[in-house]
């Protein structure tokens, strides 16, 4: 029988969380990260305790957030729960291998924010957004999350053999180039993947 999309998504989620903590970074029980897969991303976010800077951004975006693959929501301070929220509306329409990349992408963001808070030696996430390096950090985490997510996508897609990758490599490069030209015209140069 065909597994329904919820079962498929939850299996992917479990496998990728395991992959993340086995291959990308060590698990740290002091970092409380909840991962939710929901029908309505915006509603789920509103249930959460957010830092003020993010609350403003969320209110401004509104229900547009329901069209994203997922996002990371930061609590007011690093000792509270960080939320990784993934869309049950958007993700089932994607290539399942891309879903794997998305889980890794969002988890990378969540940990990058913890790392940056540690670097700044702060626990209040609002201060993080005001820090002098925030723009540089923002570009870094976007690159880092895409790198990890895209690497996972490619790795999983061609798990049965790299010959297939060699065969399709030009399509992937064309895809990256197309993404770059679409987004760079909007001034978002980090949008490579």
Residue ranges and their predicted role:
Residues 1-75:
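A metal-dependent hydrolase signature that marks the N-terminal structural subdomain at the beginning
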Residues 11-15, 97, 105, 139-143, ...:
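A structural signal for well-ordered alpha-helical segments within the folded catalytic domains
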Residues 53-103, 113:
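Active-site scaffold of zinc-dependent metalloenzymes
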Residues 97-98, 112-143:
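Post-HEXXH active-site segment of zinc metalloproteases
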Residues 109-120, 147-159:
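Secondary-structure boundary elements
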Residues 135-151, 190-193:
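Short, hydrophobic/amphipathic alpha-helical patches that form generic packing surfaces
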Residues 149-176:
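Short helix/loop segments within enzyme catalytic domains
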Residues 170-193:
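Pan-zinc metallopeptidase signature
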